[in-house]
Structures are given as structure tokens and as C-alpha cells.
Design a protein with these regions (language model features):
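Positively charged
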Residues: 1-190
């Protein structure tokens, strides 16, 4: 089974909207930043480095501001094992996430806020059973399928120091980078 996502590249380069509330947002790191290749340590709820609820809220606002579906703490230069994913007003914070089981695989084009305008076909499981902690430290389980499974796995890769470009086949990566370069040139983006 093959799924395809398309995205409006003109929308992606528009200036982000202003957050609705006074929740602080974070700056995204660039694709070359070394934090993207580091394994993130577990978030310690016994001795939290930050307020988990406030931190998750800021991740959500940053994700919305940048028109994303998912955002990990390390994409904002924080070494915490947490990410958020969702759309509209429905986002879920995943602290210390892990996959319990997964299904057969599917192909889909993915993008990443840390790699603007780069769409790559990536193979991932279509369905995943997962465990994580919410912002109160309570253990949760969920089953994600389709784009939600893909988003969870993409963000979990960030937690494990894996960027999606390393999951692409070499020729697909080369073609994607070439297409991205042409698009950035046509949009006059450096």
C-alpha cells in the first residue's frame, strides 16, 4: 500500500502566523545542527528540568507557528525525550515515547521542519502500538495508523538521533535535494 502526501510549497514559505496566546515559542535548529544526531535522554519526571506542561505547550505553539504536524524538543535545541504531534487544536505531548509493536510497511512522502522544502519517500510501518508518558508523567498507550503512525515514528527517530534523510534511498535523496535546490532558487531562498 502506498500513501502520498502533497504539500503546498508556497504555503510553507509564507511568514508564520502569530501565536494566539502569550505562550512562548522556540526557534528551530537548522538541519546541520549536531543535536539532531544525538540520542535524547529520558525526561525525568522525578526531577523535571522544566515544567512539562509549559514546555509541551510551547512545543505545540512552535509546531503550529511553523505549520507542522510534529515537533521534537531537540529540533528546538533542547535535550529532552519529548515531542508533540497533531493538527488544529488537537495535539498530544509524548514524553519518553517507545514503540511496542508495528505492522507491515508503507511508503509516503515526508517532510521535516528542520529540512525546509525537502520531501522524501520514506518506508515506515503503517500501524504502531506505542507507549509514552503525558505531561503529568502518567503512562499512556495508543495505536496510531496512517499519517499519525508516520508522524510518531518520524518524531521518535528525532529522539534517537536519526534524521529522515538517512532513511531515504540514496537516489531518492539525491533527486529530492536537487528538486529542493531548484525550488529554493525559484523562490529566491538561500
Amino acid at each position: 500500500m502506498s500513501e502520498i502526501i502533497s504539500f503546498n510549497t508556497e504555503e510553507l514559505v509564507k511568514a508564520p502566523a502569530t501565536p494566539a496566546q502569550s505562550i512562548p515559542t522556540f526557534k528551530l535548529v537548522s538541519e546541520e545542527h549536531p543535536i539532531l544526531k544525538k540520542i535524547m535522554p529520558e525526561f525525568d519526571f522525578q526531577n523535571p528540568p522544566v515544567n512539562p506542561n509549559e514546555f509541551a505547550s510551547s512545543l505545540v505553539e512552535t509546531c503550529k507557528l511553523n505549520k507542522g504536524y510534529g515537533l521534537s524538543a531537540n529540533q528546538c535545541n533542547f535535550e529532552y525525550r519529548v515531542f508533540v504531534m497533531g493538527a488544529g487544536d488537537d495535539y498530544v505531548a509524548h514524553f519518553n515515547p517507545k514503540v511496542v509493536s508495528s505492522s507491515s510497511e508503507s511508503h509516503m512522502v515526508e517532510g521535516c521542519l528542520s529540512f525546509p522544502l525537502l520531501g522524501l519517500s520514506i518506508t515506515r510501518p503503517a500501524i504502531v502500538d506505542v507507549e509514552y508518558q503525558d505531561f503529568n508523567g502518567e503512562k499512556k498507550t495508543a495505536t496510531y495508523s496512517g499519517i499519525s503512525a508516520r508522524c510518531f515514528l518520524h518524531e521518535l527517530d528525532h529522539m534517537n538521533g536519526i534524521v529522515y534523510t538517512s532513511r531515504a534511498k540514496p537516489l531518492a535523496l539525491q533527486q529530492g535535494m536537487k528538486k529542493r535546490h531548484k525550488l529554493m532558487k525559484s523562490l529566491r531562498i538561500k
